[in-house]
């Protein structure tokens, strides 16, 4: 299996990819380096495919990878309570149904100008 090292140890690389994948699912668009964008594309595609399956085993597999972060918080005036949605709930309830008719290719990578400071090639990765 080929992958990019991204200048990190394996545990650091896996943690970074989990964080970036979760951020992309929450925000639906992030700015990162080209190499990182190409690497997280693989995991995001797998997570959305799990979301499309939608069964309990797929939900548990996705929960083992996606961080438990709050995606959105809403205030309900009637009950005077805040309700929050996690990244996993957003994946299964909002993102996966959007791609029900699409077989792969859920992300788009747009190259942008190099980063100031070290001229690293930058890219925007977003959900289509």
From Swiss-Prot:
Name this polypeptide is given: Large ribosomal subunit protein bL17
Pfam families assigned: Ribosomal_L17
Keyword Protein transport part of the UniProt annotation: no
Top-rank taxon, per record: Bacteria
Classification lineage: Bacteria, Bacillati, Bacillota, Bacilli, Lactobacillales
Transmembrane segments: none
Protein family (similarity comment): Belongs to the bacterial ribosomal protein bL17 family.
Gene Ontology terms, MF aspect: structural constituent of ribosome
NCBIfam families associated with the record: L17
Keywords: Ribonucleoprotein, Ribosomal protein
Keyword field contains Ribonucleoprotein: yes
SUBUNIT field: Part of the 50S ribosomal subunit. Contacts protein L32.
GO BP terms: translation
HAMAP family named among the record's database cross-references: Ribosomal_bL17 (MF_01368)
GO cellular component, one term: cytosolic large ribosomal subunit
């Amino acid at each position: 299996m080929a992958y990019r090292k991204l200048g990190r140890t394996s545990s650091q690389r896996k943690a970074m990819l989990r964080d970036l994948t979760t951020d992309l699912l929450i925000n639906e668009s992030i700015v990162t380096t080209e190499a990182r964008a190409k690497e997280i594309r693989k995991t995001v595609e797998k997570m959305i495919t799990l979301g499309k399956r939608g069964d309990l085993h797929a939900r548990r597999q996705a929960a083992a990878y996606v961080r438990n972060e709050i995606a959105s918080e809403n205030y309900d005036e009637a009950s005077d309570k805040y309700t929050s949605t996690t990244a996993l709930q957003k994946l299964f309830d909002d993102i996966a149904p959007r791609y029900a008719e699409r077989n792969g290719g859920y992300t788009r990578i747009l190259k942008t100008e190099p980063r100031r400071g070290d001229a690293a090639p930058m890219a925007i990765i977003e959900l289509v």
